[in-house]
Structures are given as C-alpha cells and as structure tokens.
Amino acid sequence: VPEASTAHEVTPVRTTPESRVFSPAAVVASCGGFVLIGALQALYGPSIPAFRDDFALSPSAAGLGLSAHFVGGVAGVLVFDRLYGRLGNRLLLGSSYLLMALGAAGFALAPTWPVALVAALLAGLGFGGIDYGLNQLFAVGFGHRSTAMLNILNAHFGVGAILGPALVAAVGAEHYPALFLAFAAANLPLLLCLRGVRDQVPQPVPGTTGTAAGGSPLSRSLGSVLAVFVALYVLHVGIEAGVGGWEPTHLEAVGYGAGAAATATSGYWLMMTAGRFLAAPLALRHSPRTIITVSCAGMTVCLLLASVPALAPYAYAGVGLFIAPIFPTGLPWLNAAAPRARRAGALVIAASMIGGVAAGPALGKAIEWSGVRAVPLLLDAVSALCLLATLWLIRATRPPSPLPSLSPLPSPSPVRSPAP
C-alpha cells in the first residue's frame, strides 16, 4: 500500500463573519505581537558586551542568555499546545504576553546573572506561546487566505528582528535595561485587543479522512509524513540561521571588507522580510506545495552561486528572498496533509527552534573540517535535502486517483425476425 494513502489534502474552512477567528483590530495587534517577539529575540545578541561588563561574564556565559530564551521558547510551544483547546485562546495568548512582559522586565532589573537567566527563560516561555499560538490560529482562521495571512504575520517577525539591533545601536548596548523595560511595556496594550480573538476556532472538515479501508489511520505512514515535515523545518531553519550567522565571515574570507559584509548580511534579512510580504499575494493563486518547491529550488541555486565571490552578496540576498515563504507556507500544508495529527504544528515549530540553535555549532564543526570558503556549498547540500524532502511530501500527500468506473456493457440489440 503506498504511503500516500494516509495523508491527503483537506478542504479549507471558509470563514464567515460569524465564524471568523480574528477581528481586524486583533489581526493588527497580532502582527504587532510578532514585531515584538522578533525584536525580543534580536535584542540579546547586540547586548552581550553590556552583559559581560555588568556581570563580569565570559563570552560563553553571556551567550547563555539567548540559550535560556530558546529553551523557554521550546517549552512555551509545548505547553501552549498541551493547553490548546482546553483553555480559551484569549487566556492562553494573554498569559503568553504577560509572561513575555514579566520576563523582559525581570531581565532588565535582575541583580545577578542567574536571576537574569531565569527571567530570560520566563520571557522565552511567553515567546513560544505567542509564536505557536498565533501561527496555529492564523493557519486555520482565514480559510483559503490562511497561507497569505501567515506570510504577512511572519514578515512582521522580520520587521522586529531588524528593529531590535537598530534600537541597540541607536541608544547603546549599555542601556539595554531601558530597551527591555520598553519592550515589556509594549506588550501590555496588546492585551486590550484580545477581545477580538475567538476563544474556540472552527475545525477543518476533511475532504478525505486519510484512513485505511478499515477506518483506522495507518500510523506508520502518517508518522513518515510528520517526520519529513520536521526534517524540512529543521533543515531550512538551519540554513536561515547558518546564512545569518556565517555570511559575514564567508564574505570577509573571500575579500570583502567588514562593513560591506555587514551590509550584505542586513540585505539578507531585509530580503527575507520582503519575501514574506511578496509571498502573500502569490499564496492566493498558488498551492503551498508549489510555493515551497520553487522556494527550495531557488534557494539551492542561489547558495550554489554564493560560492562565486563576485556574486556572493547578491546570491545571499536571493537566498533570503527564496527561503522566506517556507516556514509560514508549510503550516497550512501540514494541517491539510495531517488533519488528525493535532500536535503536528507544535512539533514542527519546536523542532525549528531546536534546528536554529543547533545550526551554529553544527556548521562550525563542518567549517573546521572544510574551511570558511565552503560555507555556501555546505549550506547548498542542506538546501538540496530540503528540495528532496519537499518532492517526497508532494508525492506522499497527493490524493489518490479515483478508480475508473466501469462502463456498463451495452444491452444486446433485439434480434429482428426477417420480414415475410
């Protein structure tokens, strides 16, 4: 029995004014929430020199702040998913915003580094709840427009990720407590907009149930689909983090100055943000599988071109453009391909966070063996795996062709007796 028999497309929910999940004000507030979580994640890195001065830390100890944030993020995804459907969406999102605010304020006011790490963990817990909660609700809350809305939502994360370091540069890393306190205060107005979020969301009605002939799902096949989705998310987020972390080093190694390398890396992040805004109208015309296939193919070509020094800065910008839609576009595809796997979204989002954390050390080990100049080729090999995973998922989630109906045999013509 082919594995495609247990993971099929479903008919998306058509939203009506009575069934919509978000009011217009809540949509705007949700995008604002994603600006905040993007900024929060991006505040830690540029503030590390100030952490070291204030708490007399080694570089590795100072880096634990971001690690605590990511650990809290993974825990927040898993906790939110466990409570999703049991508690109302407003309560869960409101609790997540409050945890982020309390954690950020605690980090700003912490008297010792261990207290600061606990606060970063708390802020990360709220970060994970917002990240998973809004992604999950946007994936099911806009019917056929969900993919487009997810791209817009995640584009605002990129806006925050660009805004955070810019604020640190503007006010100085030594003033990081003021930035974290301002971030904490910015969470509070968003609580007022939660009245526009529906507490319970409509569930998609499968067009095909994905069950075997006897009515029970073939769990091995569904497990394979989920495993490949997880692999796709871990690998592409690893590429995203790998380019962001190692592009400046690679460009300097092939002859670019530090300023030019930093500018090119900023261009990569800008293109990734722009790519998600650009993908929104495309998502209304093309299926998620088509968008992700083109994205993986384009990303693979651009990483190959990045190995040519003269083309590298422009090729990395192309990587940002093509990688942009994969994360938000994959979630509706996952929900459609595995409608019975309720925790599938939490699994891939948590896995993507782990992939982002693991990408730096893993790529660093590979670079020790192959050299910095091999960075684009190493990432290109990972991108090729993303493309293969996408092609496998297209085959595995394709609805089976209906059996051809047998035409009834024509009835025999009556035998006419010869005329007398």
Give residue ranges: language-model regions:
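Helix-breaking motifs and short loop linkers at transmembrane-helix boundaries and internal kinks
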Residues: 56, 88, 109-114, 143, ...
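Helix-loop-helix hairpin linking two adjacent transmembrane segments in secondary transporters
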Residues: 144-145, 152-199
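Helix-to-loop junctions at the C-terminal end of transmembrane segments
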Residues: 76-89, 172, 275-288, 367-368
